[in-house]
Amino acid sequence: MNILITAVSSSTGPSGICRHAYSLACCAVSRKEISQVTLVVGKWQESYFKHSFQMEDMKLSVVVVDIHNDAFARNLWYLCELPRLANAVAADIIHLSFPVPIRRATLNRPVVVSLHDLYPYDEPDNFGFPKVYFNRVFLQQCLGEVDLVTCVSETTLSRLNTRFPAVAKKKGVVVYNCVNIKSSRHSYSVITDRPFFLMVAQHRANKNITMALRVFGELLKRERIDRRTLLLLLGNHGPETTTIKSVIEREALGDSVKLIDGVSDEELIWLYKSCDILLAPSFMEGFGLPIVEGLLCGSRVVCSDIPTFREVGGEACYYFDLYSDKGSSGLATAICDALTKPKRKAEDLERFSLEEIARNLMTVYFGLQENSIEETNRGETVALHPAGS
């Protein structure tokens, strides 16, 4: 079987979509049933993928798309050029790493899309207006065109069922994100001689980075944490970057907060292993990849008590209530509490392993292929025996 995986997005650095696309490729090449995997990235993503991931597998071919990195050009590529590429590489299945506009009739093969969240509806501030309305249209169009929707968590499937019950019933299945980070791999230090907290998040409203900054600043002022402690924010710049920088300036945190766009997997492993606290105060998430990666590497995780984090983190995390009367003081209390206790041992993380997710994906792919063959055979039968003959 030949799989084509698309990752062409606006991201130029660390993002959940990029890591997800790479993990899909790793799952596919690990299976003997798969003969070829084609991973498609934008020209602006090429350096990040090569720097951050191991891409040497003989079954993996990386195709770099040289177009403008703007929404119109990317969407036009999916609509017009993806069908040509799929034919050129003789793909049996197309796996979209996130929802994009496609025309199923021009693709002539089964298409599956990974659904991470429903942010165009649940977190419109992530996109701004009127852009969010275009994202809603593209999401609906994609969900209507694809053959199957693999939701990255039960929480995401539940949100899909709330918004699009017919799609959830007919096409929705849960295939967790593959967490393909090896804590045993040799790691490289990024920071020396300073304790630090880590937050892995794109600069978007749902990540609640500004609360983390204010709480961190308050802990420093009140000397409830080591005054040398650094808060490292790892993630792509985005709609909230200007606000984040203004909070850093207003709280006089310039020497205590560091923004980083990208690191290699080896550097990321070191950060997870070495941080005093891994922070995730999000309002809403589809999965929570940094939490699972952090737990696999032994991080002490402090996060908001939201359904997705409970689903993936279980009892291994230190939770705080975003909506209690205590407000941000709840996060401060959770941080201080976590620092005084040993790291908790995470359980049931094998459900996110490459082996487990690869098996689940094979079930999805072969099911789609069998359905496609049956539909083709039915079509041929109708053609051979037209009504009234």
Residue ranges and their predicted role:
Residues 1-389:
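Carbohydrate transferase catalytic cores enriched for Leloir-type hexosyltransferases
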